[in-house]
């Protein structure tokens, strides 16, 4: 048994200026950059987000710009197995998360719990 839920929407930006990208998206979404958030570092900028909503993060990338989601779980291997049975494929396994690809081609990440209140609004998988 494990739990999982939508954790974050990541806006992948192929840019040399992640601060400018974050400024644009922050203003577009009405959520300023949160400079004190531990996720604001290197090529990442966190936007201010209420604790009961998915995180919005701007990420500097080398691939084409796109949007992807993160699914947070209390058991990454179990969630990867569950999603694999649905047809998703593992693209890359990193130290703290797994990149997967849906049967329809979209990439997404399976990550450890990151938002407060977990497992509120999470689905229990037996």
Predicted feature descriptions by range:
Residues 17-32, 79-85:
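Amphipathic alpha-helical segments
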Residues 1-3, 25, 38-39, 48-50, ...:
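A generic structural signal for short, solvent-exposed coil/turn residues
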Residues 29-38, 85-93:
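Short secondary-structure junctions
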Residues 1-22, 67-71, 114-126:
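N-terminal beta-strand motif that seeds the catalytic metal site of vicinal oxygen chelate
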Residues 15, 51, 64, 69-107:
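Vicinal oxygen chelate
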Residues 31-67, 107-114:
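Conserved short beta-strand elements that form part of the metal-binding/catalytic scaffold
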């Amino acid at each position: 048994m494990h739990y999982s839920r939508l954790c974050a929407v990541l806006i992948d930006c192929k840019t040399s200026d992640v601060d400018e990208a974050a400024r644009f998206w922050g203003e577009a979404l009405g959520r300023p950059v949160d400079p004190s958030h531990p996720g604001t570092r290197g090529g990442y900028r966190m936007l201010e987000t209420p604790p009961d909503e998915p995180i919005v993060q701007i990420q500097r990338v080398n691939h084409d710009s796109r949007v992807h989601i993160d699914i947070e779980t209390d058991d990454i291997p179990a969630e990867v197995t569950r999603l694999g049975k649905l047809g998703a494929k593992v693209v890359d396994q990193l130290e703290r998360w797994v990149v997967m690809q849906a049967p329809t081609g979209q990439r997404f990440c399976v990550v450890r719990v990151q938002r407060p209140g977990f497992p509120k609004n999470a689905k229990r998988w037996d």
